[in-house]
């Protein structure tokens, strides 16, 4: 996580986020909805506000890799929560 010091970390977790529900929306909205689902999942599980969740570029690239109509069914994300409540998420290796 660039920009924050390791001393400020409160919680670090790796999540597998299911995105099957995204298949129920119209095809041209799926990748955009998947981004919202990832953000919403992190808000629920890291107990913070949506404005404080920062998604890394690699998550966005993974969700849009096959186009807007075919996002992946699940995604593994490494999320770090800092003392000020900010959550930074990146694609897990």
From Swiss-Prot:
UniProt KW Ribosomal protein keyword: yes
Taxonomic superkingdom: Archaea
A single BP term in Gene Ontology: cytoplasmic translation
GO CC terms in record: cytosolic large ribosomal subunit
Pfam families hit by this protein: Ribosomal_L31e
Annotated GO MF terms: structural constituent of ribosome
Keywords on record: Ribonucleoprotein, Ribosomal protein
Similarity-based family: Belongs to the eukaryotic ribosomal protein eL31 family.
Record-given protein name: Large ribosomal subunit protein eL31
Protein's gene: rpl31e
């Amino acid at each position: 996580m660039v920009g924050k010091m390791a001393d400020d970390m409160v919680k670090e977790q790796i999540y597998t986020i299911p995105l099957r529900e995204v298949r129920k929306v119209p095809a041209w909205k799926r990748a955009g909805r998947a981004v919202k689902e990832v953000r919403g999942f992190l808000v629920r599980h890291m107990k913070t506000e949506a404005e404080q969740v920062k998604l890394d570029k690699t998550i966005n690239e993974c969700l849009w890799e096959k186009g807007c109509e075919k996002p992946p069914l699940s995604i593994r994300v490494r999320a770090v929560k800092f003392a000020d409540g900010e959550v930074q998420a990146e694609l897990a290796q």
